[in-house]
């Protein structure tokens, strides 16, 4: 069990049978009245966030989240298949479960998959990936205002913003947490 007074950023806990992670917290001790812990937390299953004040003595079960490094194998159109790098066991996931991550994953790329009670609920691609530009407008010479970007489609189908000098066929480094262009490779 974990008490609300032990909340720190990144701590996982269960409430009403759902797993949550603490995003932000603040211990508040007003001049008058009882102390409380103002907490912003995220539901690990559906991604929803909430803010709530808890009594510091409130107790919650600790959510045990298992993390596995898995390799993205292929998609059959409906399901996305990942293989455990240790046991070689395959796990099929639906589009809803991989929605944000799949736009940055190529076949045979590794991803971190989080499990709650043996059921996968979150897929995290590597923080940085290198993908090839498959479609973009050519940069116009003389269009040199600072920080001008254009849209580009990468080989996985994701659409990102890149500087004007990036052309079709170039390989770029992307931060998957923000979806931003980092550099040309």
Curated annotation (Swiss-Prot):
One annotated Gene Ontology cellular component of this protein: cytoplasm
Highest taxon above the source species: Bacteria
Keyword annotations from UniProtKB, A to Z: Cytoplasm, Elongation factor, Protein biosynthesis
Entries under InterPro entries matching the protein: Elong-fact-P_C, NA-bd_OB-fold, Rib_uL2_dom2, Transl_elong_fac_P/YeiP, Transl_elong_KOW-like, Transl_elong_P/YeiP_cen, Transl_elong_P/YeiP_CS, Transl_elongation_fac_P
A GO BP annotation: peptide biosynthetic process
Main location: cytoplasm
Keyword Protein biosynthesis carried by entry: yes
GO molecular function: translation elongation factor activity
Compartments, as annotated in UniProt: Cytoplasm
Biological or metabolic pathway of the protein: Protein biosynthesis; polypeptide chain elongation
Keyword Ribosomal protein: no
Function description: Involved in peptide bond synthesis. Stimulates efficient translation and peptide-bond synthesis on native or reconstituted 70S ribosomes in vitro. Probably functions indirectly by altering the affinity of the ribosome for aminoacyl-tRNA, thus increasing their reactivity as acceptors for peptidyl transferase.
Similarity annotation: Belongs to the elongation factor P family.
PANTHER family documented for this protein: ELONGATION FACTOR P, ELONGATION FACTOR P (EF-P) FAMILY PROTEIN
Protein name per Swiss-Prot or TrEMBL: Elongation factor P
Gene (UniProt): efp
């Amino acid at each position: 069990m974990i008490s609300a007074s032990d909340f720190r950023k990144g701590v996982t806990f269960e409430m009403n049978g759902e797993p949550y992670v603490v995003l932000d917290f603040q211990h508040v001790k007003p001049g008058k009245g009882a102390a409380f812990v103002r907490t912003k937390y995220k539901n690990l299953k559906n991604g929803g966030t909430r803010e709530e004040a808890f009594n510091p003595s409130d107790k919650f079960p600790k959510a045990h989240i298992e993390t596995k490094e898995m390799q993205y194998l292929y998609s059959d159109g409906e399901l996305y298949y990942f293989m455990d790098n240790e046991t070689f066991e395959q796990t099929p996931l639906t589009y809803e479960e991989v929605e944000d991550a799949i736009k940055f994953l190529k076949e045979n790329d590794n991803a971190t998959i989080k499990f709650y009670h043996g059921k996968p609920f979150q897929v995290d691609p590597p923080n940085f990936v290198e993908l090839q530009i498959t479609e973009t407008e050519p940069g116009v010479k003389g269009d040199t205002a600072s920080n001008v970007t254009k849209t580009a489609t990468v080989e996985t189908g994701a659409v990102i913003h890149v500087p004007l000098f990036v052309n079709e066929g170039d390989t770029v480094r992307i931060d998957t947490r923000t979806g931003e262009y980092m550099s040309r490779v």
